[in-house]
Amino acid sequence: MIIAIGCAAGRIMSTLGLPFAAINTDWRELENCAADSKLPISEFGLGAGANPVIGAQAAEDAAEAIATLCMESVLLVAGLGGGTGTGTAPVVARIARAQGCEVTAVVTWPFPFESRRWAQQARRGLTALQAYVPRIVVVKLRELLPLPPATRLRDVFEMADHKAASAVMDTLRGP
């Protein structure tokens, strides 16, 4: 089962046309996601406000529902740095491992221009994820830089989604 966690992962997986489940604290983003199964978490559905603690707590509160998504082998897809992907992914990984699932992850690392705070949160999120996931593919978005000066921000993030989608496909194909 592929589980996309957060806004970035939902966008990434929606480009691939593969079956997947999506978990998000932002219910509007979840609604627009192409997932086969959608699990809204959080009390109000307004996102985690770039706060991983809120993302983690929302996942803890939804642990039973998350467990129903975890079968045999789980591929987690998440963007690190913000609140939902960073905070929720380690909780989902822990739940999946507790059920005996083999867990792999593909995560994106923030662009250098996204902020020092996002880089720090990404580092902490990756460390938390490593406790439960033996194989993590980190897609470093800085590898897309430098960009032509006239590149729109929307296009930059679209390129990032495609780079991450390629990593997901490579991971599914195996070594």
For each of these PLM feature ranges, what is it?
Residues 1-175:
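Tubulin/FtsZ superfamily GTPase core signature
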